Amino acid sequence: MAKLHDYYKSSVVAELTKEFSYTSVMQVPRVEKITLNMGVGEAINDKKLLENAAADMAIISGQKPLITKARKSVAGFKIREGYPIGCKVTLRGERMWEFLERLISIALPRVRDFRGVSAKSFDGRGNYSMGVREQIIFPEIDYDKVDRVRGLDITITTSANTDAEGRALLAAFNFPFRK
């Protein structure tokens, strides 16, 4: 079991129950899933770019990504409906906890000029979204084998009802919010 999951069960649940005065342990917010998304717009011209992006995402997440396709044709972007334009992975359970642990303790501190992540990126329902400009902040990615530096979107979906609860949950995991 991931250390972060143990820490959640032993410390965070009690801490949040006390802070928000929940009557049941089931009311305490928990991380439900983490979604990683990588849009590869250049894949229209070169299919190899999408394969490389999917391989990078598989290394980062430990799971084979789903290739996302364009929902409708857009002449301005020169894409047609059904064209593969990105990839995504949904992490749950053990892999989710391991990824969150690596993100907080290893990957985010490796970002250049890192001063913390914005605390304003909550969606109003306690879910947190952030973008990473370079996939090379993850230690699993070999810098010499990267063909192009790509960014990815990370969405942390929680069972929290409000942004305050979601922020308290992530702050309890020592999530590096900007002061």
From Swiss-Prot:
Q: Which UniProt keywords apply?
A: Ribonucleoprotein, Ribosomal protein, RNA-binding, rRNA-binding, tRNA-binding
| Swiss-Prot/TrEMBL GO biological process terms | translation
Pfam families to which the protein is assigned, alphabetical? Ribosomal_L5 (PF00281), Ribosomal_L5_C (PF00673)
Q: Name one GO molecular function term.
A: tRNA binding
Q: Does the keyword Chloroplast apply?
A: no
Which residues belong to the signal peptide in this entry?
none
Record's GO cellular component terms: ribonucleoprotein complex; ribosome
Write out the function statement from the record: This is one of the proteins that bind and probably mediate the attachment of the 5S RNA into the large ribosomal subunit, where it forms part of the central protuberance. In the 70S ribosome it contacts protein S13 of the 30S subunit (bridge B1b), connecting the 2 subunits; this bridge is implicated in subunit movement. Contacts the P site tRNA; the 5S rRNA and some of its associated proteins might help stabilize positioning of ribosome-bound tRNAs.
Q: How does it assemble?
A: Part of the 50S ribosomal subunit; part of the 5S rRNA/L5/L18/L25 subcomplex. Contacts the 5S rRNA and the P site tRNA. Forms a bridge to the 30S subunit in the 70S ribosome.
**HAMAP family registered for this protein in UniProt:** Ribosomal_uL5_B
Q: Tell me its family.
A: Belongs to the universal ribosomal protein uL5 family.
Q: What protein name does the entry list?
A: Large ribosomal subunit protein uL5
